[in-house]
């Protein structure tokens, strides 16, 4: 016991250097000292719990379908509802974080999302499942306070790494739930419950954990380096901001006022365009991740078939000649298509899980790359890191679409996943610089862009799944490569990628 006490005391005793605004200049992963590292670990753990519960229904869907006699359409629509719910919520949560602080908002999301999760066992039909997952989608909004929290606690030199780590490790909950929920389900069955009762009891467990965490963080963590949100230090106003709100007007000439007004208007225009581009690009990385997670195992089953297996074509043509319904044709096609696959459902899911497991380090890798280039190239370095990761993602998606063997597909899939999640890390290493007074709003908008992208990609998948599933990944790759070029038009703190080349030319002139 004494050893444990000494260990905990050591974790709390580590001092962290801070800047003039009170933000941490150091990152000590194995410390839980308040306020910085306590906030870091709290935000990532809460986000992890939110993702675990958000997707907690998915592993139990086969049993739920069996009990409620649900169609594939019901299940597909419930999945769309789960993602769609977070789009508007992420936009709303951002301003709420600016107003009340990340701690209270994170607590509110966990407590609110735990209620429908705990009541999941009461649903009776497909409509009930759709409505249920719509409300459980509240938990998807936890991403915004998670990123907001670390942006408030860490300064510009390490905020990219901090944001990437909490985001990536939080996303791991989406993979962990496919291990956790089946284990709870089997444990309840082992205790004597039948499978229909077991899933209803199993969903209560993550709901209970979310509820406990939602209450606990109110008393064990801080909103900002100063503690409560009301004591936070606001970003320093520039002379421009001061002129706009009317202070020091007497010190300015009329010409200076007009210049400031035009400058502010130009700055706001660039802010809007930058936020829009980041929303689009987050849809090209996080949106791709969410969409890929929902279709990847099916793609592998469709793609890799036993050579010469034509059972599907024969039986489908026979069914069509007999005049059966479209629904029967589709079900027959799906069953035979799986029969011809080299993989079974378990092995396909195992391979597909690799895509999500890269969150353990890949998102942080993107943030670290952004921080490293920032030290040498300043803000243009962050923009270059962002564009390189997106371009790499696009190239790997195109290569993956052309793979015809399972080993090569696994290798390219893993590399592609690293680029996808690294791009997510570089995206949110840029967010704190867009408008420092509105980090929460911008984080919410960008996060909503990711979910919007996921819905768009899933809609395209529906159109291509029966024609050429590989084309879906090819289209994604082309879109991502094109979207990466938009980075050239991002302007943050009056800096673009082009400023790097201008500075190089200026240095050469000075040397001459």
What are these regions (language model features)?
Residues 55, 82-91, 141, 175, ...:
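Residue-level signature of mid-helix packing/kink "hotspots" within the transmembrane helices
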Residues 160-186, 210, 359, 444-457:
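Glycine-rich segments within core transmembrane alpha-helices of 12-TM secondary carriers
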Residues 1-52, 267:
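Cytosolic juxtamembrane N-terminal segment immediately preceding the first transmembrane helix
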Residues 132-169:
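Cytoplasmic helix-loop-helix junction between adjacent transmembrane helices
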Residues 57-61, 271-364, 424:
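Extracytoplasmic gate region of multi-pass secondary transporters
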Residues 88-127:
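Conserved MFS/SLC helix-loop-helix module at the cytosolic interface between two early adjacent transmembrane helices
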Residues 104-118, 380-398:
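Structural signature of the two symmetry-related core transmembrane helices
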Residues 69, 101, 122-127, 139, ...:
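Helix-breaking motifs and short loop linkers at transmembrane-helix boundaries and internal kinks
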């Amino acid at each position: 016991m004494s050893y444990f006490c000494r260990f905990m005391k050591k974790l709390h005793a580590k001092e962290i250097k801070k800047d003039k605004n009170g933000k941490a200049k150091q990152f000590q992963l194995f410390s839980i000292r308040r306020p910085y590292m306590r906030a870091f670990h709290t935000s990532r753990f809460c986000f992890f719990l939110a993702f675990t519960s958000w997707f907690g229904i998915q592993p139990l869907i086969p049993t739920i379908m069996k009990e409620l006699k649900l169609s594939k359409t019901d299940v597909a629509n419930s999945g769309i509802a789960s993602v769609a719910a977070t789009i508007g919520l992420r936009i709303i949560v951002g301003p709420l974080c600016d107003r009340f602080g990340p701690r209270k908002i994170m607590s509110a999301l966990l407590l609110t999302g735990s209620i429908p999760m705990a009541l999941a066992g009461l649903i009776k039909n497909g409509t009930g499942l759709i409505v249920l997952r719509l409300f459980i989608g509240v938990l998807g909004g936890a991403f915004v306070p998670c990123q907001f929290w670390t942006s408030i606690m860490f300064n510009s030199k390490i905020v990219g790494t901090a944001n990437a780590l909490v985001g990536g490790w939080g996303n791991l909950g989406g993979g962990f739930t496919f291990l956790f929920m089946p284990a709870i389900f089997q444990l309840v069955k082992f205790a004597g419950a039948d499978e229909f009762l077991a899933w209803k009891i199993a969903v209560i467990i993550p709901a209970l954990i979310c509820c406990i965490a939602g209450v606990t963080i109110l008393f064990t963590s801080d909103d900002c380096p100063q503690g409560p949100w009301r004591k936070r230090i606001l970003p320093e106003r520039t002379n421009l901001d001061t002129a706009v709100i009317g202070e020091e007007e007497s010190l300015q000439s009329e010409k200076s006022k007009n210049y400031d007004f035009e400058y502010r208007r130009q700055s706001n225009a660039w802010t809007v365009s930058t936020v829009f581009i980041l929303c689009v690009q987050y849809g090209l990385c996080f949106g791709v991740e969410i969409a890929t997670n929902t279709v990847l195992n099916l793609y592998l089953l469709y793609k890799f078939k036993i050579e010469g297996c034509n059972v599907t074509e024969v039986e489908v043509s026979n069914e069509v000649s007999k005049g059966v319904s479209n629904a029967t044709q589709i079900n027959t096609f799906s069953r035979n298509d799986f029969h011809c696959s080299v993989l079974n459902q378990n092995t396909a899911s195992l391979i597909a899980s690799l895509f999500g497991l890269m969150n353990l380090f890949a998102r942080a890798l993107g943030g670290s790359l952004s921080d490293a280039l920032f030290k040498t190239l300043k803000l243009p370095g962050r923009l270059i890191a962002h564009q390189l990761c997106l371009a790499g993602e696009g190239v790997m998606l195109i290569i993956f679409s052309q793979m015809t063997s399972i080993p090569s597909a696994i290798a390219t899939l893993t590399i592609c996943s690293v680029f996808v999640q690294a791009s997510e890390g570089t995206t949110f290493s840029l967010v704190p610089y867009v408008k420092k007074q509105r980090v929460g709003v911008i984080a919410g908008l960008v996060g909503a862009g990711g979910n919007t992208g996921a819905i768009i990609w899933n809609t395209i998948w529906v159109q291509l799944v029966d024609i050429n599933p590989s084309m879906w990944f090819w289209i994604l790759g082309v879109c991502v490569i094109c979207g990466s070029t938009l980075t050239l038009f991002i302007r943050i703190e009056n800096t673009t990628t082009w400023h790097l080349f201008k500075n190089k030319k200026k240095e050469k002139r000075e040397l001459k």
